[in-house]
A protein has these predicted regions:
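Catalytic cores of alpha/beta
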Residues: 281
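Aromatic-lined carbohydrate-binding surfaces of glycoside hydrolases
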Residues: 2-5, 12-207, 215-227, 260-261, ...
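Catalytic domains of carbohydrate-active enzymes that cleave complex glycans
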Residues: 140, 144, 148, 152-189, ...
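Glycoside hydrolase catalytic-domain groove-lining segments
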Residues: 222-263
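Active-site clefts of carbohydrate-active enzymes
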Residues: 182, 248-278, 296-297
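Glycine-rich anion-binding loop/nest that anchors nucleotide
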Residues: 257, 290-306
Length: 402
């Protein structure tokens, strides 16, 4: 390949030698989801949800997600679906064009949620340390009451009917409540939460058979309630034996990063070397982790301009702003999302995870040995780009000969 460029000092020719390996990257061999903000899309691109302009812009965001091999999208349920409170009645058709837009873009599954909420303090902040949940769509209603139960049953029954009508019931992952075992003060508080969580899970499974419950967690303590476990990388390392046992049992374990960990830990923050965002996925391959979740694709709250400030405000009341770049991978350009280098690093990481999976199917011992030259755990690794490329090339050579 010859590329000829013109500079102000004269002409030069750049010769690139490219080695093409006879290896195809498996598509959708590794689960990836990045949560997005519909409100931020509307605000930055001057479109209104439910309009054709919004759907066209959403399609551009979906294409950006697919570029980095994202194959799952998250639709948060809101009170627009609630058409009556006495009796409880729900209508989800307003979500249909948006859901179809993502499936048309090539997505394979969707996340829905949530059923439960922590409620609010008197000052309006979320009640992060609560020992009991309220209904997510009706936050003035305690979940652990007969009326809360009735509300939730009617909600799930209506949702199940809607999903079956569109043929989507087998493509759903459901969040009951994000991080249910994080932020509590006493063991009794956690146990009270767990009892309510299991009740919600039983309602889901009764009226939407076959649904998979997915949740970001800190431990394996909600066994029997969760189907797809998503510990943070630090939580996984702290309880590696627990989560590895779940993997050996045949359960799905993914991972995520959010707010932390910082320092030498692998993460995708804006002030971290790009290679760390890619190595996150090498760690997934090494640990037999089947998916990656992140909360921040374009999470720009009101007043945040990612071109001027990179830290997202934290409204939970339990900490400072989120670290720089934690809340986004794309920038809101004039014609749609503009892709950043961190998205490209995540794209390569997802491709790598799929390729490592191919090698493990054929040569598991070699898979572990090669990965071990670069990755030990999520805070012990080699971030020398040359070494990474050397191991990557050996991976491709091995796959070519398989």
């Amino acid at each position: 390949l010859r590329l000829q460029g013109v500079f102000w000092e004269g002409n030069c020719t750049c010769i690139l030698e490219i080695q093409v390996y006879k290896v195809r990257i498996p598509e959708d061999a590794f689960w990836v989801t990045n949560w997005f903000s519909r409100e931020a899309i509307c605000r930055f691109h001057q479109v209104e949800e439910g309009t054709q302009g919004f759907l066209e812009m959403l399609g551009k965001y979906g294409a950006a997600m697919r570029r980095m091999h994202q194959n799952i999208f998250f639709i948060t349920l809101d009170d627009r679906c609630m058409v009556s409170k006495s009796p409880w009645k729900f209508d989800f058709e307003y979500l249909t064009p948006m859901i179809q837009c993502f499936f048309d873009a090539g997505m394979k599954r969707m996340e829905l949620g949530t059923l439960l909420h922590r409620g609010f303090l008197e000052n309006g902040e979320p009640n992060m340390y609560t020992d009991s949940f309220v209904c997510s769509l009706e936050t003035g209603l305690k979940f652990d009451t007969l009326e809360g139960y009735a509300h939730t049953v009617e909600l799930v029954k209506s949702l199940a009917k809607y999903l079956r009508f569109h043929g989507w019931e087998k493509q759903v992952l459901f969040h009951i409540h994000d991080e249910p075992d994080i932020h509590y003060k006493k063991p009794e508080d956690l146990e009270a939460r767990r009892r309510e969580y299991y009740l919600a899970a039983s309602i889901l499974r009764k009226y939407l058979p076959g649904v998979s419950v997915i949740e970001a967690v800190e431990s394996a303590g909600f066994y029997g309630g969760v189907d797809v476990w998503v510990p943070g990388t630090a939580g996984y390392e702290a309880r590696k034996e627990e989560f590895d046992r779940l993997i050996r049992l045949g359960e799905q374990v993914w991972t995520y990063v959010c707010c932390s960990p910082e320092g030498w830990w692998l993460n995708r923050f804006l002030d971290f070397p790009l290679i760390r965002g890619r190595l996150l996925f090498w760690g997934c391959a090494k640990n037999r982790i089947q998916g990656f979740l992140h909360w921040g694709f374009n999470q720009f709250p009101e007043g945040m301009d990612p071109f001027r400030g990179t830290s997202c405000p934290n409204d939970t009341g339990i900490g400072t702003n989120f670290p720089c770049g934690d809340s986004f991978l794309v920038y809101p350009g004039p014609g749609g999302p503009e892709i950043g280098m961190r998205l490209e690093a995540q794209r390569r990481g997802a491709e790598d995870a799929a390729l490592w999976g191919l090698l493990r199917e054929n040569e598991e011992a070699l898979h572990d040995r090669l990965l071990g030259e670069v990755f030990v755990n999520n805070h012990t690794y080699c971030q020398d780009p040359q070494k990474l490329e050397e191991v990557y090339e050996r991976l491709l050579k091995e796959l070519e000969s398989c």
